């Protein structure tokens, strides 16, 4: 898939810049899990993303990625951000298994309901 036609979809793992950041927010070029649907992402050029870190701390809003993916670490569900994936030149690096995506959405629910 060429970058010009790429539209992130729920479950994709992308790499993009999280700068600028403030306080306890994740920063820098890093992988992230896309949680918003492709229809929204295409129409708005925005996507809801949860950053991924290689440093697990055992927090309740961390969801571990299984071994064997292009990216390892934990999804930081409570650090969800809405970012312009086109302007930040998001690059597809992998895909999370469906059970991981479901777990991320389940842990996100109490934060937004």
Where are these regions (language model features)?
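Conserved functional hotspots at enzyme active or ligand-binding sites that engage polyanionic ligands
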Residues: 1-113
């Amino acid at each position: 898939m060429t970058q010009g036609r790429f539209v992130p979809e729920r479950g994709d793992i992308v790499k993009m810049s999280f700068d600028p950041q403030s306080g306890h927010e994740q920063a820098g070029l890093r992988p992230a899990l896309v949680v918003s649907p492709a229809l929204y992402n295409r129409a708005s050029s925005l996507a809801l993303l949860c950053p991924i870190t290689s440093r697990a701390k055992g927090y309740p809003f961390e969801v571990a990625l299984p071994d064997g993916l292009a990216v390892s670490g934990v999804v930081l569900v409570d650090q969800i951000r809405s970012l312009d994936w086109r302007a930040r030149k998001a690059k597809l690096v992998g895909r999370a298994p469906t059970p991981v995506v479901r777990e991320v959405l389940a842990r996100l629910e109490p934060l937004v309901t």
